[in-house]
């Protein structure tokens, strides 16, 4: 379809409400938003070297708030609905995948509950997603 696809992966279990820094990954069907952002010349590009090797399995790790803000800015630039996939890690071994579509025309984010929604940590995962 002609809806851009973006994937975000949350690696730590800290809630957004606590203000803790989060490490995440973003993919898109048309290429990486992070790679297309200011990785080569921005001051935040040095933060990517601070990412742990355990995250190397992800396509692109976002290690700073500036990186996350740049990805969000690029997602919000679309004038057509954007498909966003969010992977939240509940534990080291368990994660849930949330599929969503952001419609920029009416500023509504549609979120589908994951089919593999595990009872363990489900409240925390849902709160973290919000």
UniProtKB/Swiss-Prot annotation:
Belongs to the ODC antizyme family. This is Ornithine decarboxylase antizyme. InterPro entries: Acyl_CoA_acyltransferase, ODC_AZ, ODC_AZ_sf. One of its GO terms (molecular function) is ornithine decarboxylase inhibitor activity. GO terms for cellular component: cytoplasm; nucleus. Residues 32-51 have a biased composition (Low complexity). The gene is Oda. Ornithine decarboxylase (ODC) antizyme protein that negatively regulates ODC activity and intracellular polyamine biosynthesis and uptake in response to increased intracellular polyamine levels. Binds to ODC monomers, inhibiting the assembly of the functional ODC homodimer, and targets the monomers for ubiquitin-independent proteolytic destruction by the 26S proteasome. Interacts with ODC1 and thereby sterically blocks ODC homodimerization. GO terms for biological process: positive regulation of protein catabolic process; viral translational frameshifting. Residues 1-56 are annotated as: Disordered. Keywords: Developmental protein. Residues 1-14 have a biased composition (Basic and acidic residues). Residues 17-27 have a biased composition (Polar residues). The keyword Transferase does not apply.
């Amino acid at each position: 379809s002609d809806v851009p696809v973006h994937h975000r992966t949350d690696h730590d279990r800290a809630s957004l409400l606590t203000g803790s820094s989060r490490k995440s990954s973003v993919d898109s069907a048309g290429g990486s938003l992070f790679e297309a952002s200011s990785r080569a010349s921005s001051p935040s590009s040095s933060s990517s070297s601070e990412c742990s090797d355990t995250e190397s399995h992800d396509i692109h790790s976002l290690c700073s708030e500036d990186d996350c803000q740049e990805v969000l800015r690029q997602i919000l630039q679309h004038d057509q609905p954007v498909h966003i996939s969010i992977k939240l890690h509940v534990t080291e071994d368990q994660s849930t995948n949330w599929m969503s579509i952001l419609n920029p025309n009416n500023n509504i984010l549609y979120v589908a509950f994951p089919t593999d929604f595990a009872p363990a940590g489900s409240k925390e995962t849902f709160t973290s997603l919000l």
